[in-house]
Regions:
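Residue-level recognition of short, well-ordered coil/turn positions
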Residues: 22-23, 148
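Gly/Ser-rich "nucleophile elbow"/oxyanion-hole loop immediately N-terminal to the catalytic nucleophile
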Residues: 1-5, 149
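The feature captures the conserved acid-bearing segment of alpha/beta-hydrolase catalytic domains
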Residues: 25-99
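Gly/Ala-rich beta-loop-alpha elbow adjacent to hydrolase catalytic centers
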Residues: 5-10, 14
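Active-site signature of alpha/beta-hydrolase-fold catalytic machinery across serine-
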Residues: 16-20
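Alpha/beta-hydrolase-fold serine-hydrolase catalytic core, especially in secreted/extracellular enzymes
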Residues: 96-156
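Active-site-proximal flexible loops/turns
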Residues: 15, 38, 103-106
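Divalent metal-coordination and catalytic microenvironments
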Residues: 2, 91, 140
């Protein structure tokens, strides 16, 4: 069984693989729009596929995008999953981190992350990354190894 994950546009590519490839069993997208689901543009609006997302997906968001998902048209597919009834679509908001704070760049170059995200993270980067790593591992364990039922953390 194959799981794929990525951050930002890499996560968009992972989401596309989950839709296109039959050998992908689960996808984790770290603050990534469903770009592959955009079928075209009609009167200035994105036209999205109506096909349900075919595999379990965990979407992880930072403060950078969480409050703007419904405003940003490239995130229309994400909003549909947030408000839909897909039984294996999970959405996790990690408060206190910015877009690059979802990556290990926060450990190797905290100053660069602070500059790129526009502010100092309100959450400790190590704590935030530990939460992301543990959640992603439990998600893949559940959907790739059939080790229990996945549940989001209670109070991230």
């Amino acid at each position: 069984r194959i799981g794929v994950m990525g951050h930002s546009l890499g996560g968009s590519a992972a989401l596309g693989m989950g839709r296109e490839r039959g050998d992908v069993s689960a996808v984790i997208a770290l603050e990534s729009p469903f770009m592959f689901d955009i079928q075209g543009v009609d009167h200035g609006e994105f036209v999205l596929t109506r096909e349900p997302y075919p595999v379990p997906v965990l979407n992880v968001y930072s403060d950078s995008a969480w409050g703007h998902l419904s405003e940003w048209p490239q995130y229309a597919g994400n909003v549909a999953l947030l408000s839909g009834d897909h039984p294996a679509a999970f959405n996790l908001h990690i408060d206190g981190l910015g877009h690059l704070g979802l990556t290990d760049l926060a450990l190797s170059s905290p100053l660069l992350v602070r500059l790129a995200d526009g502010a100092r993270p309100a959450r400790d980067s190590v704590e935030g990354l530990r939460l992301i790593n543990e959640t992603c591992l439990r998600f893949f364990d559940a959907y790739l190894k059939n080790h229990g039922k996945f549940q989001l953390p209670v109070a991230p």
